[in-house]
């Protein structure tokens, strides 16, 4: 894409897109996704010796800080003999606090020198590739070149010969010190004028060509977008025409010079009326590469303008490559870290397939994940961008734009949103989707792989799945997630979420707070996890797990299994034949209709069988068991339990009633036919409702029977009954 002009100018990025302007799919091919490990943070200063307490594993990132120019940080890592590894250190993009020129040293187990690198990575960052000769502990020694700098850095370790950068490190590669439109980096607030150039040849004497109407429209659209997403403001001079009286000017020329377009970086120091030279920020399009007619989003030409405006905003290429006539640059030979592709930044030369994204997507529709992070580092974020309740995808708030998946059938984008209660709507898709509402995570949208992300700092609250087997991950906000049709897997994450699986057999996990979950149609698995959750199974046979917290579980239709987990839970089986398990806590179990199994668990539980022939098992604790209608079997199962009966209770069995335990009782207070001990055991000439039948006692209540297994009539007394 880009080349530095032959008479080097540090403010110029001249871009040659011809190497990428080939039929889609001609890139390296669908590459594998790279593994990302843990991110470790230096809290106390790392020792500059083998006594360091910091250690990282392969695929981890270590985020450190050189507190002074002379500071050195050592980090241990275990390597395997014969395996090739690449180590990299880069600044983190925090311009006033980032180490701009880190130096990397690799040391053996005793601290002896193995190798060093300075500037082997992008820009002035460092990278080493090494094949371990012995298995064991090695040390990565991070310092600044010639003890000349301090500040934050990121350190990575991966297998193979290409480094891996996390977002902070990658944003650092896009930024250059003192190349921004603001005097105070990160605060924004400046207004920069721009215009469509009226006249004037290129700096190297190429004949000026006015922008076509389509080029003007695309430029205006992208500049309005750039104005909206950052703390920097742009004002067009003479919006309906042209002008040469603006800080940033857009012009065109036509020449086969190997450059598809080029742009100048912002200035570095104040001076003159605006503080910048005449060239800084200017953009030139080469009409031999950039279309004058077809500049819709996703096209090469639209993307070219987006890329050049990135330079005009202060973004550099992520690697040390600059194309021109006769120069061949490939991902295999030129990319210095794995994430240097269009999947992460519009400033890359390389197709997104190199980092694992599906082919056939075209070019990025928006700034991408690392671009947003870098731009917001320079100018601050824009909290008013799309600040209403915005829908992205189908039924989009902004119809006909890149955010409308009816119009944009091959989305390759990152979404930044300032405020409001927002939704990603995938309801128009029939294939499986993976959508993460977490910032900085790649999603698989529209049948493609890794083509969608949510920018850092953006919060999207809600999601609507499609008709395929979707996987949707929530975030820490209070999410509302609708799975739609298909066998979906939905994870709520943090926040008090509302999740509805919709049709088919879904798996739903509420996450860390109190959630409201609906299974809908299909045999669903619903897990509340942490928090006080309310869960409705819906139709068909569901598995409902409350997890921790005081949960309310409703099986509704179908042969359901409900497990309360820890906490004081309420379980209602609903219709059909259900199994309810209270586990820990003082639980309430309601079987509802059907032949149900209720098992109380460890504490003092209330079990109500409801209609049907139920089995109630109390477990440990002082439980209350009421079989309800139907022929029920009740087991107190340890301690002193109470068995409750009312009219029309059916023919019930108590398997483990202990007549000798004065704290275990049969409660007839809701039974109209037996009102006293005499009614049960008889007195004088009275007829007893209870009789000995073999080893058991059978009590005839008039509307049913109660069989006390292995109980002697003579052992029953007033302490065994409540009237």
Predicted stretch roles:
Residues 139, 156, 450-452, 457, ...:
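Low-complexity acidic/polar repeat-biased segments
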Residues 92-94, 207, 292-305, 323-334, ...:
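Acidic, glycine-rich calcium-binding repeat modules characteristic of RTX/beta-roll
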Residues 3-7, 14-73, 111-126, 148-150, ...:
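Acidic Ser/Thr-enriched surface turn/capping motif at secondary-structure junctions
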Residues 61-152:
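Acidic, Ser/Thr/Pro-rich low-complexity intrinsically disordered segments
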Residues 2-39, 158-211, 262, 273:
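Disordered inhibitory propeptide/activation segment of secreted metzincin zinc metalloprotease zymogens
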Residues 91-94, 110-111, 145-148, 199-201, ...:
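Acidic glycine-/aspartate-rich tracts in secreted/extracellular proteins
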Residues 137, 160-187, 214-342, 349-358, ...:
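Metzincin-family zinc-dependent endopeptidase catalytic domain
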Residues 77, 364, 370-467, 473:
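Pan-zinc metallopeptidase signature
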């Amino acid at each position: 894409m880009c080349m530095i002009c032959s008479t080097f100018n540090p403010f110029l990025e001249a871009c040659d897109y011809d190497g990428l302007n080939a039929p889609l799919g001609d890139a390296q091919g669908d590459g594998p996704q790279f593994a990302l490990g843990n991110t470790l943070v230096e809290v106390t200063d790392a020792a500059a010796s083998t006594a360091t307490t910091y250690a990282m594993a392969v695929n981890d990132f270590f985020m450190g800080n050189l507190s002074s120019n002379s500071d050195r940080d050592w980090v241990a890592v275990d390597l395997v003999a014969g395996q090739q590894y690449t180590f990299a250190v880069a600044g983190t993009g925090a311009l006033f606090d980032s180490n701009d020129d880190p130096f990397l040293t690799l040391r053996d187990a005793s601290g002896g020198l193995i190798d060093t690198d300075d500037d082997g990575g992008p820009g002035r960052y460092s990278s080493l590739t090494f094949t371990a000769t012995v298995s064991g502990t090695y040390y990565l020694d991070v310092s600044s070149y010639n003890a000349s700098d301090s500040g934050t850095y990121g350190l990575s370790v991966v297998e193979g010969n290409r480094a891996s950068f996390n977002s902070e490190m990658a944003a650092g590669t896009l930024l250059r010190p003192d190349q921004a439109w603001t005097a105070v980096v990160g605060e924004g607030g400046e207004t920069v004028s721009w215009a469509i150039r009226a006249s004037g040849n290129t700096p190297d004497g190429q004949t000026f060509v006015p922008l076509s109407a389509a080029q003007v429209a695309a430029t205006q659209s992208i500049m309005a977008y750039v104005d909206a997403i950052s703390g920097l403001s742009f004002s067009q001079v003479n919006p309906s025409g042209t002008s040469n009286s603006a800080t940033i000017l857009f012009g065109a020329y036509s020449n086969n010079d190997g450059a598809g377009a080029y742009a100048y970086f912002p200035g570095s120091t104040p001076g003159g009326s605006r503080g910048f030279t005449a060239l800084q920020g200017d953009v030139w399009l080469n009409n031999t590469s950039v279309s004058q007619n077809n500049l819709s989003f996703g096209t090469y030409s639209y993307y070219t303008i987006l890329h050049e405006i990135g330079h005009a905003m202060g973004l550099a290429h992520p690697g040390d490559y600059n194309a021109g006539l006769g120069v061949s640059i490939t991902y295999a030979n030129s990319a210095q870290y794995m994430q240097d592709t269009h999947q992460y930044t519009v400033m890359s030369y390389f197709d997104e397939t190199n980092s694992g994204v599906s082919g056939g997507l075209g070019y990025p529709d928006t700034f991408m994940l690392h671009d947003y992070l870098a731009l917001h580092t320079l100018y601050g974020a824009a909290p008013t961008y799309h600040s209403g309740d915005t829908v992205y995808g189908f039924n989009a708030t902004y119809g006909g734009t890149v955010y409308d998946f009816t119009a944009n059938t091959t989305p390759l984008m990152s979404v930044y949103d300032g405020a409001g209660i927002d939704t990603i709507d995938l309801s128009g898709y029939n294939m499986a989707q993976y959508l993460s509402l977490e910032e900085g995570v790649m999603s698989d949208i529209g049948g493609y792989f890794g083509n969608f992300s949510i920018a850092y700092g953006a919060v999207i609250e809600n999601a609507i799945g499609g008709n395929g087997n979707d996987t949707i991950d929530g975030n820490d906000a209070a999410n509302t997630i609708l799975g739609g049709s298909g066998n979906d897997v939905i994870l709520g994450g943090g926040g008090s979420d509302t999740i509805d699986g919709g049709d088919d057999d879904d798996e739903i996990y509420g996450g860390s707070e109190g959630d409201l979950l609906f299974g809908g149609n299909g045999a669903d698995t619903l897990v509340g996890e942490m928090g006080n959750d309310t869960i409705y199974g819906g139709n068909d046979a569901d598995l409902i797990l409350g997890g921790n917290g005081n949960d309310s579980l409703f099986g509704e239709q179908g042969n359901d299994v409900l497990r309360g987990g820890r906490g004081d839970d309420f379980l209602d089986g609903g219709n059909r034949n259900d199994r309810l398990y209270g586990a820990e806590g003082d639980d309430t179990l309601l079987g509802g209709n059907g032949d149900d199994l209720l098992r109380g668990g460890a504490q003092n539980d209330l079990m109500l069988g409801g209609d049907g022939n139920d089995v109630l098992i109390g477990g440990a604790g002082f439980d209350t068991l009421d079989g309800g209608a139907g022929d029920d079997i009740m087991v107190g199962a340890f301690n002193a339990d109470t068995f409750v009966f009312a009219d029309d209770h059916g023919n019930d069995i108590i398997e483990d009633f202990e007549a000798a335990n004065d704290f275990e009782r049969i409660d007839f207070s809701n039974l109209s036919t037996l009102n006293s001990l005499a009614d049960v055991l008889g007195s004088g000439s009275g007829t007893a409702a209870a009789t000995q039948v073999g080893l058991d006692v059978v009590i005839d209540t008039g509307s049913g029977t109660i069989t006390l297994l292995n109980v002697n009539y003579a052992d029953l007394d007033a302490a065994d009954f409540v009237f």
